[in-house]
């Protein structure tokens, strides 16, 4: 925990809350969550660490937009990102159980109906259009002009980590992933819920979809990436299988390869945090256990790349930047010469 119940309670009191109770919810690794009860109404308080406080405004804004467009998410109430206090979003509590906890209690017919609702809700999120690609950044922007360039940049960062750790197997997996990116078609600019997890889907007592929760990892790019994140974690789940079938991805070899790519992409990204403490100091799962499916298919992407090919890759990445630098330098030189003459 990076917050305290007493500290949050004191802040809420200064902000006008009265006659309330707080209860800590021991779930998640990126945020601290509390149940807030006041005037017979129940809320969730989702608290963010200081270095991610900028997310409160962004996630709050997206939640408002989702609610307006009929997407099943928690209804936001208020947010705060004060520099001298706890940054949080307060939204109305969503009653129900997570789909992960509910899974074993559901019949095949119930799962089929729930998956219809889940797919529809996910597709509605993907209908939100953006202007660029990548992870959500401060001010709600996405920073890449190319989806491929975003993927390759993330893979390069992971490769550097594995190289530093002298983990040659995962270095070669990164090399294979990098090469596979060239086969991916540029998707349209659309929002991607990249926290697609059975833990982040709430099901009501009457076995209906109540809400998706957790939107701090929003991306802009290929919606299949979000589905693959579910696969990477829950590869053997009957719910995952049902969702893939409804998306038409289950029996399509090319699409399955793309799903595997995105699953392993998630693996190599999260692996770079494996030796770091979690923001709320909760235990971090062993990545091969947490992303079990991804760990079983990652070696399908292994490829040894020699130094010459590495140099070619570097040049392709830097070509545009070098061209801009050269043109800028020439224009500056011409301006100086012109001034001297």
Place the predicted regions along the sequence by residue.
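An alpha-helical support segment within catalytic cores of ATP-dependent transferases
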Residues: 2-18, 111, 116, 127-194, ...
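Conserved catalytic motifs of the protein kinase core domain
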Residues: 40, 85-86, 187-189, 208
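A conserved long alpha-helix in the C-terminal portion of kinase-like catalytic domains
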Residues: 220, 231-307
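N-terminal Sec-pathway targeting helices
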Residues: 317-328
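Sec-dependent signal peptide cleavage junction
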Residues: 337-341
């Amino acid at each position: 925990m990076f917050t305290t119940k007493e500290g949050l309670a004191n802040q809420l009191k200064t902000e006008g809350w009265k006659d309330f109770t707080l209860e800590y919810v021991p779930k998640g690794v990126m945020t601290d969550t509390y149940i807030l009860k006041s005037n017979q109404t129940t809320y969730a308080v989702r608290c963010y660490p200081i270095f991610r406080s900028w997310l409160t405004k962004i996630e709050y804004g997206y939640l408002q937009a989702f609610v307006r467009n009929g997407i099943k998410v928690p209804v936001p109430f208020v947010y705060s990102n004060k520099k001298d206090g706890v940054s949080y979003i307060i939204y109305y509590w969503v009653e129900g159980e997570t789909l992960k906890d509910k899974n074993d209690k559901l019949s095949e017919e119930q799962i089929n109906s729930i998956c219809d609702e889940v797919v529809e809700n996910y597709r509605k999120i993907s209908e939100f259009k953006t202007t660029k690609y990548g992870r959500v950044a401060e001010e709600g922007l996405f920073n890449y002009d190319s989806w491929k360039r975003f993927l390759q940049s993330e893979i390069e960062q992971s490769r550097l980590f594995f190289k530093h750790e002298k983990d040659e197997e995962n270095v070669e997996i990164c090399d294979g992933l990098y090469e596979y990116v060239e086969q991916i078609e540029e998707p349209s600019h659309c929002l991607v819920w990249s926290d697609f997890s059975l833990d982040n889907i709430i099901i009501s007592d009457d076995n209906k979809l109540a809400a998706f929760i957790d939107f701090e990892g929003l991306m802009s790019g290929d919606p299949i990436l979000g589905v693959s994140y579910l696969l990477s974690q829950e590869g053997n789940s009957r719910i995952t299988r049902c969702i893939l079938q409804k998306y038409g991805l289950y029996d399509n070899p090319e699409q399955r390869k793309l799903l595997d790519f995105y699953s392993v992409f998630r693996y190599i990204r999260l692996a770079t945090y494996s030796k770091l403490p979690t923001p709320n100091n909760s235990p971090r799962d062993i990545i091969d256990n947490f992303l079990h499916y991804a760990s079983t298919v990652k070696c399908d992407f292994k490829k040894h790349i020699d130094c010459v090919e590495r140099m070619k890759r570097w040049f392709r990445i830097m070509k545009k930047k070098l061209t801009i630098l050269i043109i800028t330098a020439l224009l500056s030189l011409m301006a100086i010469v012109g001034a001297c003459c």
